[in-house]
Amino acid sequence: MAGFDWFWKALGGKSGRNQKRSVAIVNQVENHAAELDALDDVALAQRAKDLASGGRIDNHAEFLAILGVASQRTLGLKPYPVQSQAVLRLIEGDVVHMATGEGKTLVGAMAATGLGLMGKRVHSITVNDYLAVRDAEWMRPLVEFFGLSVASISEKMDAGERRQAYKAAIVYGPVNEIGFDVLRDQLITRREDAVQHGADVAIIDEADSVLVDEALVPLVLAGNQPGHAPRGKITDVVRSLKENDDYTIDDDRRNVFLTDKGAAKLEQQLGISSLYDDEHVGSTLVQVNLALHAQALLIRDIHYIVRDSKVLLIDASRGRVADLQRWPDGLQAAVEAKEGLAVSEGGKILDTITLQALIGRYPMACGMTGTAVEATDQLRTFYDLHVSVIERNHPLKRFDEADRIYATMAEKNRAIIDEIALLHSTGQPVLVGTHDVAESEELATALRELNIEVSVLNAKNDAEEAQIIAEAGDIGRVTVSTQMAGRGTDIRLGGADEADYDEVVKLGGLAVIGTARHRSQRLDNQLRGRAGRQGDPGLSLFFVSLDDDVVVSGGSGESVSAQPDATGLIDSDRIRDWVGHCQRVTEGQLLEIHSQSWNYNKLLADQRVIIDERRERLLDTALAWEELAQHAPARAAELEDLDQSVREQAARDIMLYHLDYNWSEHLALMDDVRESIHLRAIARETPLDEYHRIAVREFKDLAQRAVDDAVSTFKSVTIDHEGAHLDDEGLARPSATWTYMVSDNPLAGSGNSVISGIGNIFR
């Protein structure tokens, strides 16, 4: 803990003071053990309820002791003092920094149970379906011991199953599914159709992944409507273009530009006079740019894979296949056309919410991760969350070797293979962390050519990968994994049953090898943390080349001289420091992008709150009828013979349709504004100021337009005992909707537009 003293001082000491108080409370827990052990289950549960009555805990030490005794009785797990400390910090609203293997699952369940006993509804948020279902079932005996209900949400559940699950006091669910349910509930016109019940607290597992890495990933609800898919001929013509002759790609390979020669070739083969004529700018040129981006910049097995005749994106922050993600605005269809697959239907975005805004809906949020300290600035700046560092139950014995730096990528890759082969020859288990699917497959192929058996995890199946990663610590195992594969599953030395534990300890424990530095040190530390759990020995080692993305990007514009040996190895502290500098530069770039993006997103998030409140009132009261009757009294008088409930629901359907439609149009408009804000900003205002001015003006117009449109429809639509016949007026809601996550696009440039190279003509 002493190593973090400077850190707590930098934060003004608040977290440090909380830590001292928490430790003092935990030190008293054991004083209650004898008395509580003598109580039967009913009396023990009642004691906890009494302590938490009124929404606050009267005696934290005794309360933690009760949770601990109940855990031992129901799960056979006695929490360590450091786990009880983490429970207390969660209950008080912190993000706790707990190393891998220190028992976060039990900590989260104890905290959720404690908050549930205080009368709060809790969502325990995970990163995937598998962990949500696993943790809910594993921790169920503890939660139900106190008379609380627990359930889980998963992708395959229908609306009825979800509705029932959300009634539980504690709900485990993947963050994307919870967000999608929020969006779907924003389209209901009858309260009983909602699936969610409001929750008071979000406990977020892998908090840095959700709150930082994926914070600005939009969750999208779309309805059926044709989109901007490139025509087949355009795809064929673009495929014939040659790099450098017909188009150029910028140095960081994020943007592609047609040359005059390329434009002329396209115009000739498409039979048009100019791509840049008004009639083609908003249609043909958009489709050409989409096809060109798909062809030149998006690489199979790096940015996406093709499986079962479908394009599946690879999530850059997790290094995993993301079944639910799509690229926006026709790029998905462009890649499908490039691969010769059936082009998926376009759609109109009905609603969208970022994960950051989703978490902001909870009155209280807290979380757990093994790399919270590195994300302290973001957690404090964007969520006002404090980090509490929880000491390890056993001292760390892992050895973190200095980076091995090579001049070229090829030399680095040869060294990685040699090192894995050397470690494997001793029987020491090896876990290799790669950055993408293609790299992991290439590495596995090279190792198999040396007759080394390899397990490859590309995060395609969460349950299967959990079983494989659980065995990664066994003798002689070599496991190659993308960044996030298998998180949430412990790697125990000697295999899942620890049968060969002693022998693996003698070999030095699990060796973790990183094939390159990540864009932030926090991601490196996530990989390092797989070794050395619970005081086990272990090794971590990263290989770096001067050609690696983080070095090229972070060191752009700088030059460095180095003298490699015959193998390409550069053994220089100066170069290691420079690589660290490059990584810090990329971290700063990411933080700046996050900050800029949040400044744009926050106003829309605030406007969403107003829309949500308006929607709630329209759903739950007679406000819709009252307003329409006030604006169109003659029409209201014509409907007096109808049953009151029919009249009110008809008015509700009308008002909600136009509110939802205009909100959807507002989102689309503001997306357009943001894409071209650098052109629309006037000289005396910053782009952000101009964006806010437009957003406020347009939102005011939205509010009035939604009412005016509703009044117009109210006057003209047929309303009878069956309600308002909106379909007859062409006002039907989409017949089909679907949800997806907009990818953290690999092509997003410094302006953070989704496809910055297409620019303001994109739409």
UniProtKB/Swiss-Prot annotation:
EC number: 7.4.2.8
Matching SMART domains: SecA_DEAD, SecA_PP_bind
GO cellular component: cell envelope Sec protein transport complex; cytosol; plasma membrane
PROSITE patterns, A to Z: SECA, SECA_MOTOR_DEAD
Enzyme class, spelled out: translocase
Subunit structure: Monomer and homodimer. Part of the essential Sec protein translocation apparatus which comprises SecA, SecYEG and auxiliary proteins SecDF. Other proteins may also be involved.
Sequence similarity: Belongs to the SecA family.
Protein name (Swiss-Prot/TrEMBL): Protein translocase subunit SecA 2
Organism: Corynebacterium glutamicum (strain ATCC 13032 / DSM 20300 / JCM 1318 / BCRC 11384 / CCUG 27702 / LMG 3730 / NBRC 12168 / NCIMB 10025 / NRRL B-2784 / 534)
Gene name of the record: secA2
